[in-house]
Amino acid sequence: MHFPDSVGRPIFGVDVQIVSEEHQPLSANTVGRIRYKGMAVSSGFYNDPESSLESFHEGWFYPGDLGLLNEEGYLFLKGRFKDMIIRGGINIYPLEIENTLMNNHCVSEAAVISTPSKEFGEEIVAFVSLKAPISSSDLIDFCKTHLAPYKVPKLIQFMDQLPKNSGGKIVKSQLSKMLNN
């Protein structure tokens, strides 16, 4: 069986699990924190005990990614743990919203972050660069037809180009700073 959105199955000698924030294994097709261990997996970071404490727990390495394993053992990446938005007590994965926005023919790039909210704890904000004109209300309507209501961005900010690092990856911390200024 082939799963084009999967990164594949774990290699021989590496155990991969999807776990809750309490380190409890989750059932198949449930999004959670990825952890893995094996003979070739380090037990810590060299000369960095603070980072080691954050990333290693009871012999498992936590790379900071969210994902799920299907029934066949294929791993699907769903985003970064630190990027997860908790809105009204519900975990929301920005990657799903970003992919939805990217499916609109007018959108060139998209990044989703959170902003504090008195009502929900966190609210969803999307930063978008366009390749064709579209209004923020039309993009929000597009999201409403493709996402659950609680995943629809409250605000869409347009930019000519999203900030990127030297590797071409969008720098969400810069977007957060721009939003708070």
Can you annotate each of these PLM segments?
Residues 22, 38, 43-44, 66-151, ...:
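AMP-binding/adenylate-forming catalytic core of the ANL superfamily
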Residues 1-74, 81-84, 97-98:
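Conserved AMP-binding/adenylate-forming
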Residues 164:
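Short acidic/His-enriched helical or mixed secondary-structure segments at domain edges of catalytic enzymes
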Residues 179-181:
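A short, polar/charged loop-to-alpha-helix boundary motif
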Residues 156-159:
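General small-molecule cofactor/ligand-binding pocket signal
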Residues 5-8, 62, 93, 135-136, ...:
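A diffuse structural propensity rather than consistent per-protein peaks
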